[in-house]
Amino acid sequence: MDISVFSIQKSRADSFENEIKEYIKMSAKFANISDKIIFNDKIAKAQSIGKDEALKAYDEAYEPNLKGFCVMLDERGSELNSSEFAKIFEQNMQLSFFIGGAYGLSKNLKDKAQKVISLSKMTMAHKIAKLVLFEQIFRGLCINANHPYHK
């Protein structure tokens, strides 16, 4: 199983990088997981202009990566418990998760996804959402493997 997590962020260095690497390492016995950070001059310029331009730049950056079962993270997406989230992994061998940039994700991009989910009704920093997503991916894989991590 291949799982890719795509995020738009300025740099790889953040306060949760070590924790994310640890979840990737722990998940390796279940799946090949990659953390794909996307940021370029076009995104930087578009974000400084405004929301519409930024969303268009995010679309252009993400669309070539729409492979396998695509899951978008959005505050208005469906909320799942950990067992429901784990079911996503049962029938899909290639999954791609997408975390929006400062302006979220466009309707156009969300419409191309097989699933749109929310991690919480609360608003949280993107780096926290990303850490929670990696933990839930590990938890979901453990649930499906009957691993004791999820009790």
UniProtKB/Swiss-Prot annotation:
Superkingdom, natural source: Bacteria
Catalytic activity of the protein: pseudouridine(1915) in 23S rRNA + S-adenosyl-L-methionine = N(3)-methylpseudouridine(1915) in 23S rRNA + S-adenosyl-L-homocysteine + H(+)
EC id: 2.1.1.177
GO MF term (any one): rRNA (pseudouridine-N3-)-methyltransferase activity
Signal peptide range: none
Family assignment from sequence similarity: Belongs to the RNA methyltransferase RlmH family.
Protein name: Ribosomal RNA large subunit methyltransferase H
Subunit and interaction comment: Homodimer.
Gene3D superfamilies: 3.40.1280.10
GO cellular component, one term: cytoplasm
Disulfide bonds: none
Enzyme class: transferase
Function as written in the Swiss-Prot or TrEMBL entry: Specifically methylates the pseudouridine at position 1915 (m3Psi1915) in 23S rRNA.
